[in-house]
Amino acid sequence: MKRERGRRPRKRVCSFCVDKVESIDYKDTHKIRKYITERGKILPRRISGNCAKHQRQVTVAIKRARHIALLPYIVE
């Protein structure tokens, strides 16, 4: 029995590293919304393609924006 080998998905490149972004601003909700699902959850690193440093910054920015009501906690 021969096993089928699927193609490995391409490694996504961190968009913040490409643009050489120093820090992610929590007030820039337009940029942050790309990293939230339609249910309001934060996208994981393996899906968003961010590096560890920028994924932490995105997470903190999303949580800050939620706290001051720029972003919703739950999208209905």
UniProtKB/Swiss-Prot annotation:
Keywords: Ribonucleoprotein, Ribosomal protein, RNA-binding, rRNA-binding. It comes from the Bacteria. PROSITE patterns: RIBOSOMAL_S18 (PS00057). The keyword RNA-binding applies. GO terms for cellular component: cytosolic small ribosomal subunit. InterPro entries: Ribosomal_bS18, Ribosomal_bS18_CS, Ribosomal_bS18_sf. GO terms for molecular function: small ribosomal subunit rRNA binding; structural constituent of ribosome. One of its GO terms (biological process) is translation. NCBIfam families: S18. Binds as a heterodimer with protein bS6 to the central domain of the 16S rRNA, where it helps stabilize the platform of the 30S subunit. This is Small ribosomal subunit protein bS18.
